Amino acid sequence: MTNIRKTHPLMKIINDSFIDLPTPSNISAWWNFGSLLGMCLIIQILTGLFLAMHYTSDTLTAFSSVAHICRDVNYGWLIRNIHANGASMFFMCLFLHVGRGIYYGSYLYKETWNIGVILLLTVMATAFVGYVLPWGQMSFWGATVITNLLSAIPYIGNTLVEWIWGGFSVDKATLTRFFAFHFILPFIILAMVVVHLLFLHETGSNNPTGLDPNSDKIPFHPYYTIKDILGLFLMIIILLSLAMFSPDLLGDPDNFTPANPLNTPPHIKPEWYFLFAYAILRSIPNKLGGVLALLASILILLIMPLLHTSTQRSMMFRPISQTLFWMLTANLIILTWIGGQPVEQPYISIGQWASISYFTIIIILMPLAGTLENYMLKPKFP
């Protein structure tokens, strides 16, 4: 008798996705981040659901309701800390996942890559509206500054900003709609993840060598299920350590002060995972130019497949491209640091140079390196 998991319409989908899925035998720990991101999403949805039961999206009570969750709700402090730090873990895994994709040429699976970039943008939008909800000083001013960027759009800018605000400033209407967005977006993300996996399973996973893996595949279970569980345990240990021992390490002290429209904090800055983009935004003296650079810093990922000039898929055997990749990584770390610094010299200049080099490495140097490596690999006879 055939096993039910191979015949039942619903079980068959699960079986073909997580149990009998043919997987390359040589994928490294860099391939763990997909499952970790899935777990992050589940953790965020569950903790978020419990927080939403006690949160009130009203300007007068939002801040107090978060304090109430932490003080009076059973394990409310833990749920809130896991949710806040879970976002940091989510972005850490996201950045590593995207970095893996760039390094090993996974972007050549165009449909999977494109839906992944859209997912990244959606997660960033969700995190942004979520950061506004506690209604602290940085929540309020972060929302004011970032939504104000839309006013740089010619002709319709100001109307668009007031439309998003639901008035003439960030107020009750803004908070209420941001809560609605923050509640619905994770479920949209969940649906997009299914599409992301659907496209991935059309082609199968890439592998570190970038070569066709069809000659050597193994079933996903038990080999990669056990490997994913190990990664999951490590992530949960880090997340719980962060949530229990230093829950406010990655937060902003200004957010312990209730929102006050009459008092601007000395340094308005977003959470750490947006700082690289914020640094690029601030590097351009023109408002519209800054907004376009901010968008380009993320949307540049969409043209990665067009910039691939090498005959090899992966960077595993391409030392020049590898050097550029790690230069790009260092560059992003510098941008993250600059994004958190005040707008004064030498930070302004460092930020501008880092922004220029970010785009130069991706658009000019990486394609050139690929072409050069192709030339170096050509056999040269006397």
From Swiss-Prot:
PROSITE patterns: CYTB_CTER, CYTB_NTER. It is found in: Mitochondrion inner membrane. One of its GO terms (biological process) is mitochondrial electron transport, ubiquinol to cytochrome c. Its cofactor is heme b. InterPro entries: Cyt_b/b6_C (IPR005798), Cyt_b/b6_C_sf (IPR036150), Cyt_b/b6_N (IPR005797), Cytb/b6-like_sf (IPR027387), Cytochrome_b (IPR030689), Cytochrome_b_C_euk/bac (IPR048260), Cytochrome_b_N_euk/bac (IPR048259), Di-haem_cyt_TM (IPR016174). A ubiquinone binds at H201. The keyword Protein transport does not apply. Heme b b562 binds at H83, H182. GO terms for molecular function: metal ion binding; ubiquinol-cytochrome-c reductase activity. The chain crosses the membrane at residues 33-53, 77-98, 113-133, 178-198, 226-246, 288-308, 320-340, 347-367. The keyword Nucleotide-binding does not apply. It comes from the Eukaryota. It is a multi-pass membrane protein. GO terms for cellular component: mitochondrial inner membrane; respiratory chain complex III. Pfam families: Cytochrom_B_C, Cytochrome_B. Keywords: Electron transport, Heme, Iron, Membrane, Metal-binding, Mitochondrion, Mitochondrion inner membrane, Respiratory chain, Transmembrane, Transmembrane helix, Transport, Ubiquinone. Heme b b566 binds at H97, H196. Binds 2 heme b groups non-covalently. Component of the ubiquinol-cytochrome c reductase complex (complex III or cytochrome b-c1 complex) that is part of the mitochondrial respiratory chain. The b-c1 complex mediates electron transfer from ubiquinol to cytochrome c. Contributes to the generation of a proton gradient across the mitochondrial membrane that is then used for ATP synthesis. PANTHER family: CYTOCHROME B. Belongs to the cytochrome b family. Heme 1 (or BL or b562) is low-potential and absorbs at about 562 nm, and heme 2 (or BH or b566) is high-potential and absorbs at about 566 nm. The cytochrome bc1 complex contains 11 subunits: 3 respiratory subunits (MT-CYB, CYC1 and UQCRFS1), 2 core proteins (UQCRC1 and UQCRC2) and 6 low-molecular weight proteins (UQCRH/QCR6, UQCRB/QCR7, UQCRQ/QCR8, UQCR10/QCR9, UQCR11/QCR10 and a cleavage product of UQCRFS1). This cytochrome bc1 complex then forms a dimer. This is Cytochrome b.
